[in-house]
Amino acid sequence: RKQELVEAFEENLDFFIETSQVVRSDINLINMEIVKNYFHKKGIVINSSNEKFLMRSAGISYTDKDTGEEKCTLGGLLVFSDNNSLCIPQNMIRITNNLGKGKDRVNVVQGNLLSMIDKSEDILRKILPKNYPIGAIVEAINNAVLYREYSSIDRVIEVVISRNSTIVNSPGQMIQNNSTGKRINYNRRNMWLYEKLVTLDENKRFLNNEGGFGRIKKPFKKNVTFINSRAEDCFKVILPGTKLYEGKK
């Protein structure tokens, strides 16, 4: 399977799916303010003379061998582009509101990864009761954004809100064993993304990411279900719905 091949390359060949080349991309899609902020936080001065070198070295861009043009990597688009959906439409969070409150039933969130998390939180605050533990859903979205399988080009992160449950569905299962039977830590996926997000995130949402599952369960007294589906090749977080919080202050 494609995902297993990607996992094998990442494990044995020091290959990151995030640094794979996006042939039909344009370097002008990169938001240079985010790039400058990233290098500034690393203590590196970026200017016109070293810009291309630093971006290539960091895996944000590459030089097309045939045309000599600068183009974007997958990770470069995910982290540093506000309009990456033009090249990677799978980078999307779809929030479905089944509460029937007259608000937009489906909200589509796109952009660079950190902005997508912020936009999703804003949408959730408009949909959910004020006393609902929104932070738990945002934590699940954080994990989905960081660890989803970005090589799944026909699937997106889905958040479905109803009175009975709230579901966060992320493409790519939590692989525990590779094709040879060797155990793999879920947190090893997308390490390139992790480094970039940790560096850029002013809210420090990813610094203590290993405790994410605990932070998701705690507000609901552990009444949360995690489903790692090999058949569907996805990871689901199922939280309580809104009915327990309706009418409460």
What are these regions (language model features)?
Residues 28-31, 86, 176-249:
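Flexible, glycine-/charge-rich segments associated with ATP-binding catalytic modules
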Residues 1-152, 157-166, 174-179, 183-188, ...:
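Active-site helix-to-loop segments that bind/position phosphate- or nucleotide-bearing substrates
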Residues 166-171, 239:
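Conserved DxG motif in ATP/Mg2+-binding regions
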